[in-house]
Regions:
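Bacterial N-terminal signal peptides
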Residues: 8-17
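N-terminal soluble domains immediately following signal/targeting peptides that reside
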Residues: 21-156
């Protein structure tokens, strides 16, 4: 069932991006559970031009990383088993057309329910589509976020 959701998400992205004349905006986030440190590690890939427009600062400008950190903290919330988790920004990296953003939530021993609010770029780009892929103890889950559906949850 989970592989079907993942394939559907990828197919949806492909179909939406192949439409002629339509702008397409997306982000991808990978969430990995590290059992040894009881940490959820987030890696988010954003389009450089889109995030620069949203935070109104160019990546080569001093203070870009601080603005990205502030933006992520404002637009992402994580709840594990109903309890809010503090996200710690661990860095970002500009690589041409992509900005990679890294953050984590510590103190996660077991997950039966994971709820995420991801409104990254949804205010700036109404057609924005955010995909979050989660790996937890051998299980894979996928969440999709769009304007009007900024919050999603999965069960393990």
């Amino acid at each position: 069932m989970n592989i079907k959701l993942y394939i559907f998400a990828l197919l949806s992205i492909f179909l939406m991006s192949s439409s002629t004349g339509a702008d397409f905006y997306s982000s991808m986030t990978k969430v990995d559970y590290v059992e040894g440190s009881k940490t959820l590690k987030f890696t988010t890939k954003l389009n450089t031009e889109h995030i620069s427009s949203a935070i109104k600062i160019r990546p080569e400008t001093a203070g870009f990383e601080a603005e990205v950190k502030r933006y992520v903290n404002k637009n992402v919330d994580v709840y594990v088993n109903g309890s809010a988790k503090t996200l710690t920004f661990t860095g970002s990296q500009v690589n041409g057309e992509s900005v990679w953003v890294y953050f984590e939530a510590k103190g996660v021993s077991e997950i039966s329910q994971l709820k995420i609010r991801n409104s990254i770029l949804l205010e700036t780009y109404p057609k924005q589509f955010n995909v979050v892929n989660i790996a937890y103890k051998g299980q894979q889950k996928t969440m999709n976020f769009t304007r009007g559906r900024e919050t999603n949850q999965v069960e393990f």
